[in-house]
Amino acid sequence: MDDSKTNGRQNASRIVALANTIQKSVAELQAVLDSKGLPAPSFAEDASPDPLPFEAQKAQDAVLDATAELHDILLEPTALVLKTISNEYVAFLGFISRYDIPNFVPLGGRVSFTDIAKKTGFEEGIVKRLLRAAICRRIFQEPESGYVAHTKASKAMRSKILLTFLRTGADMGWYTIFKLVDAAEKWPDVQEQDQTAFNLAHDVQGTYFENVAKSAKNAELFASGMATQWELPGYELHHLLDGYDWTGLGKAKVIDVGGFRGRISIALAERFPDLDLLVQDMEMNEADAHAAVPSALKDRVHFMSRDIFTTQPVRADVYYIRQIFHDWSDKYCTKLLRAHTSQLEAGSSVLIHDCILPEVPGSSLPLWKERDMRAMDLGLVAHMNGRERSVDEWHKLVTEADPRFKIRQISQPEGSMLALIEVVFNA
């Protein structure tokens, strides 16, 4: 049998199957929108910035994965490889965020490349090239030759938090990844936070966090990045508030390990009046942090400056740890877990709130979401030798910390990008 003919028929069947999936799933998605009286998605400036309704998410996942696969399968091999080279993002997003172009372009109006060049001091030709690269990615539009107007994406970038997040990536983050292979060659152990692509790219000593802390500007950029992620679809706090039986704890003490400025603890205290919260983080100004807590919650939300890798001095019912493990290599994550053994007793637990990578690409997540998670994973190793982990890797990690640690359960609320991993200690 001619293998080329067989493969051709299989590919033909696949592209037809993908087209059918797209047609069926778009119809399902549109039916949800119609039932709720919602407009169809568009790139228009006045399009809704809200995520699609929860009921439409499965159809959305199917459409996005199928359209991406159909696009890729129709490319020749060389084009498929080369389309992954996206260095131009660093250039045009760096320009847009540094010079606050989204807030220079008026809502409902337009501005000329000439005016943008005058505002920024750039030569008009380079302004056109940068912004037209962005326009090809649906960021801004050119409704008339020589003029720039908003799309829903560029309008969203008027947000100070999002724009600052992009500025962080452009100024500090994205080109760090270019040194990842060099760093892995130089430090093959991939464990220490001061032996990373970040160190090579910026020619600095010390860890990423230590370097961020040296500059008030960089510290604020980092804080904005954190705030941005909490608003991304799949990372919202309601997944935590609704996804765990906090009420079932009764009157309980919860320690928010590595809780930064206490946003999560404040949200928990607002929803669950029986919880007493203590936020622990390194080099924290306890008084300043507590001053920002709403007055009605001040007696239940407290702060403690503490090196989270040293022995835990406070007993609690739950030690909640959100997206801290992914900042660290296994060497330090096992140390973090061991720091809690002296305080864990029957009924208490460590509640890890973090990503779970599929064991094999495409096996348990829509691929469009997994791509983002894999990108995050590489960003973590580039900056701090952190990592995302699969279920098997989580089990291995807790056992390596101490064989008496066991994962009691893993749950992932529908629509959440983070799983709740409940770890107990069988003393």
From Swiss-Prot:
EC number(s) stated in the UniProt entry for this protein: 2.1.1.-
Keywords associated with the record: Methyltransferase, S-adenosyl-L-methionine, Transferase
Binding site for S-adenosyl-L-methionine: 230, 281
Pathway as given in its UniProt record: Mycotoxin biosynthesis
One of the Pfam families matching this protein, by short name: Methyltransf_2
Known function: O-methyltransferase; part of the 2 gene clusters that mediate the biosynthesis of fusicoccins, diterpene glucosides that display phytohormone-like activity and function as potent activators of plasma membrane H(+)-ATPases in plants by modifying 14-3-3 proteins and cause the plant disease constriction canker.
Designated name of the protein: O-methyltransferase PaMT
Source organism of this protein record: Phomopsis amygdali
Gene name of the encoded protein: PaMT
